[in-house]
UniProtKB/Swiss-Prot annotation:
The protein's name: Phosphopantetheine adenylyltransferase
Localization: Cytoplasm
Principal place of residence: cytoplasm
Pathway: Cofactor biosynthesis; coenzyme A biosynthesis; CoA from (R)-pantothenate: step 4/5
Its EC number(s): 2.7.7.3
Length: 165
């Protein structure tokens, strides 16, 4: 039986932290669905299509080297419902620190009640990427800062282009 997991997030933009979690998740599952959450109340920097393009560009080489099938979908409902709909029995959540753990434990408990067949797996971020957040990356990039240490090269180029418009 193939192990299928869903890794949800806004991915606005994809960071080296996301890459770290995907790399680790690919050692655990056969198929990883990177799921872009679309929330009408939020105003992302990058459109859904731009985020999807970044995900494909960044993760396709990783899929080729790990043998893990990586695909990208969008969802606008409950994360656990998106997992169930896509055939995933595992939710992947990255953890940077204890604050993330406290929050994610609450969500995992609620998800377990809603859809008992979907389990949450927490993946601790590697020490080098723990301080990275997409919010901080956007802020640094918007002020002309160098974000190349925090995001893949292709994403850094997209951020630079976005803020030079």
């Amino acid at each position: 039986m193939a192990h299928v997991a869903l890794y949800p997030g806004s991915f606005d933009p994809v960071t080296n932290g996301h890459v770290d979690v995907v790399r680790q998740a690919c050692t655990l599952v056969d198929r990883l669905i990177v799921a872009i959450g679309v929330h009408p109340g939020k105003a992302p920097l990058f459109s859904v299509d731009e985020r999807r393009a970044m995900i494909v560009e960044v993760f396709s080489p990783l899929a080729a080297t790990t043998g893990c099938a990586i695909e990208c979908v969008t969802f606008d409902n409950l994360t656990v419902a998106a997992a169930e709909k896509s055939g995933a029995t595992i939710l992947i959540r990255g953890l940077r620190d204890g604050t993330d753990l406290d929050y994610e434990m609450q969500i995992a408990g609620m998800n377990q009640t809603l859809v008992p067949s979907v389990q949450t797996i927490f993946i601790p971020a590697s020490p080098t990427v723990r301080p990275i957040t997409a919010t901080l990356v956007r802020q640094i990039a918007s002020m002309g800062g160098d974000v190349s240490a925090f995001v893949p090269k292709a994403v850094a180029a997209r951020l630079k282009a976005k803020f030079s418009q």
